[in-house]
Design a protein with these regions (language model features):
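A detector for small-residue-rich transmembrane helices and their helix-helix packing motifs
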Residues: 2-199
Length: 199
C-alpha cells in the first residue's frame, strides 16, 4: 500500500494535460515530416523566406516543420522536456510563452536571415522555453523556480551558444529570436510578481 497527498495527486493531474498537448504537438511534427518526405518535401515551402511579404504567415507554420528526420530528431527531446517544464507554470502561461516565442523567433528570422533562404524548425521554440525557464525564477523570487533555472542551465545552458552566428545551415537568428521571446514572456508574465521579503 502507499499514500499520496492531495497536493501531489493534483500536481500529477496537472501534468497529464501537458503530456497530451506537448506530446501531441511533437507527434504532429512527426506526422508532418512523414507527409513532407512522401510529398518530395512539398511542405518545406511553408517555411519563412527572409523579407518576403508573402512568407509572413509562414511564421505560424515554420516551427512545426523540419528539413528531414535528423533535423526533427535533434529538436524532439529538448522540445518535449522544456515544453513540459514550461507547462508546469500553467496551461495559460505555456500558451503565452509558445505564442510569443513563435512570433519573435519568426520575425527575427524574417528580418535578418540571409536573403533567399527558407527557415524551418522548432529550435526557436526550444530556445524560447529555455530562456523562459532560466529567467522566470529571478522575476518570481521563488526558491523552487530558481532551483529549476539552475538545473535547466546545467543540462541545457550550453546550447545558448546557438544564438551566435556559427555553423552553416543553422538559424542562429531563429535561436536568438526565440530566446528574446522567452525573456519577454517571463517579464510579461512574472515581472510584476511580488518579491518575497524577509524582515
Amino acid at each position: 500500500m502507499s499514500t499520496q497527498s492531495f497536493a501531489d495527486r493534483r500536481s500529477l493531474e496537472g501534468v497529464k494535460p501537458g503530456v497530451v498537448v506537448v506530446g501531441g504537438l511533437l507527434a504532429l511534427m512527426w506526422v508532418l515530416e512523414i507527409i513532407d518526405s512522401a510529398s518530395f518535401h512539398a511542405l518545406d515551402q511553408l517555411g519563412i523566406i527572409a523579407r518576403n511579404i508573402g512568407s509572413l504567415p509562414h511564421i505560424l507554420t515554420a516551427p512545426w516543420l523540419h528539413f528531414g528526420f535528423p533535423h526533427l530528431i535533434s529538436n524532439s527531446v529538448p522540445f518535449l522536456i522544456l515544453g513540459l517544464l514550461t507547462w508546469l507554470a500553467g496551461p495559460g502561461r505555456w500558451l503565452a510563452v509558445t505564442l510569443i516565442t513563435v512570433v519573435t523567433s519568426g520575425l527575427t528570422v524574417w528580418l535578418i536571415a540571409p536573403s533567399n533562404t527558407i527557415t524551418l524548425g522548432a529550435s526557436g521554440l526550444v530556445f524560447g522555453y529555455l530562456a523562459y525557464l532560466l529567467v522566470r525564477g529571478f522575476f518570481t523570487r521563488n526558491i523552487w523556480e530558481i532551483a529549476l533555472s539552475v538545473a535547466v542551465f546545467f543540462f541545457y545552458g550550453s546550447i545558448l551558444l546557438g544564438v551566435l552566428p556559427g555553423a552553416s545551415g543553422v538559424s542562429w537568428q531563429g535561436h536568438l529570436g526565440g530566446a528574446i521571446g522567452g525573456f519577454i514572456a517571463a517579464k510579461f508574465l512574472h515581472g510584476s510578481d511580488p518579491a518575497i521579503r524577509r524582515v
